[in-house]
A protein has these predicted regions:
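Ligand-binding loop in jelly-roll beta-barrel domains
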Residues: 119-146, 303-332
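Short, low-complexity cationic-aromatic patches
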Residues: 16, 59-64, 79-86, 127-131, ...
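Short amphipathic alpha-helical linker/capping segments at the junctions of internal repeats
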Residues: 112-114, 156-160, 281, 290-299, ...
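Contiguous mid-protein beta-loop-alpha structural module that forms a pocket-lining wall or clamp
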Residues: 120, 125-180
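A short, N-terminal "cap"/entry segment at the start of jelly-roll beta-barrel domains
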Residues: 1-65, 161-250, 346-360
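A short beta-strand-loop-beta hairpin characteristic of the jelly-roll/cupin
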Residues: 75, 79-111, 118-122, 126, ...
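A structural feature that tracks compact, well-ordered secondary-structure segments
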Residues: 69-73, 99, 254-257, 264, ...
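Conserved short histidine dyad/triad with adjacent acidic residue
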Residues: 50-58, 68-85, 234-242, 253-268, ...
């Protein structure tokens, strides 16, 4: 039997989206899972890890289709064995402290620090403290697993991913005899195989955003007042991601402060969003349904093109948001509907939106 078939889509109408429902994982459930992991015998690779999985995201065990969220626990004195994979990571320490080695670079982190691990980097984690260490680790591995191209190695050679210094980018159109050259006057070019397999090199480094430094800048946004129509956040930006505004090439990570009794304006976007609330309490309204949350809760808050907004209650809220917006920017698929009274826009390929910050 042949491993293919024809599917006749002649005249087929596009079906409406079947959005997966939001989900709130309560702090108690997370704490119980942390304690369960801590009570297990130490595994051979040192990784006490539990993936938080939405029941409807399919292959890859994601909380969203493209976003994997793992609870990672290290007891005092423990470490993980070195490994590498072709997925990238954003880590967030929610309890304790520790350090990580990424291609030989050491990052010492405290509670609520954020750091990145570029793909195919050799990394290991350490808990040199006398407290339990807990991290939320966000990975794009669910996307790679859906594509059946997730590759991982345990205990690879420690120097195998050493990065050469970024070379000066040369205008390939002037390279002979294998240059890239215009085919027509309207912008169509041809590129030879020699350039295809040797694209311009972009150096990706592990980056670290210490919470105390981030908070000092973030708290200044409280002064914007209740008339401000935007969101009081900072993107933890890696310039290597360029126009896709990423923390990695797949995700952005933002830290938001939501002053008490603030209700955001409803909006929607095709990118999925996962929020971790680490101070305060409030609620989100997604497709007309209200979801309550408080500090320590994890939420799939925007399952793609769902109309949603968030609100704080009687105290300030701090939250980490992971969103797959950079991936959509790179794909040219980032529809964003900031003002529901107007039209959505394809961000990155058209002009975007503006806030009223200059007037508040």
């Amino acid at each position: 039997m042949e491993n293919y078939r024809f599917v006749d889509r002649t005249g087929v109408k596009v079906e409406p989206l079947r959005l997966i429902p939001p989900v709130v994982i309560k702090k108690k459930a997370i704490d119980d899972e942390i304690e369960r992991l801590a009570a297990l015998p130490r595994p051979l690779n040192g990784q006490r890890e539990s993936r938080v999985v939405h029941t409807r995201t399919g292959v890859g065990d994601g909380l969203a289709y493209t976003i994997g969220v793992s609870i990672c626990v290290l007891k005092p004195g423990e470490r993980t064995k070195p490994m590498r994979h072709n997925s990238s990571l954003v880590d967030f320490c929610i309890r304790g402290a520790g350090r990580t080695l990424v291609d030989g670079k050491q990052i010492d982190y405290q509670q609520y620090d954020v750091w990145t691990t570029p793909s195919w980097s050799v990394f290991e984690n350490f808990n040199d403290t006398d407290e339990l260490q807990v991290r939320l680790s966000y990975s794009n591995s669910p996307l790679l697993e859906k594509l059946n191209v997730y590759i991982a190695e345990e205990e690879p050679p420690l120097n195998s991913t050493a990065t050469k210094p970024a070379h000066e980018i040369v205008d390939s159109a002037k390279t002979n005899p294998f240059g890239t050259f215009p085919l027509s006057e309207d912008g169509a070019w041809l590129m030879p195989y020699e350039r295809l397999i040797n694209p311009d090199h972009v150096e990706l480094r592990p980056l670290h955003w210490p919470w105390q430094s981030v908070k000092a800048e973030l708290d200044k946004l409280k002064n914007l007042g209740t008339s401000y129509a935007g969101r009081r956040l900072y993107l933890m930006y890696d310039p290597a991601t360029g126009r896709t505004n990423g923390t990695t090439h797949t995700f952005f990570a933002t830290i938001t402060v939501r002053p008490k009794n603030i209700v955001d304006r409803p909006h929607r976007h095709v990118s999925a969003a996962v929020n971790y609330y680490f101070h305060g309490r409030g609620y989100s309204t997604v497709e007309g349904k209200r979801y309550e949350w408080e500090a320590g809760d994890l939420m799939l808050s925007a399952p793609g093109w769902a109309i949603h907004n968030h609100a704080s209650k009687d105290e300030d809220v701090y939250e980490l948001t992971i969103q797959d917006q950079p991936m959509h920017l790179a794909l040219g698929s980032l529809l964003w509907h900031e003002d529901l009274r107007g039209e959505p826009k394809l961000l990155g390929l058209s002009s975007g939106f503006a806030t009223n910050r200059a007037m508040v």
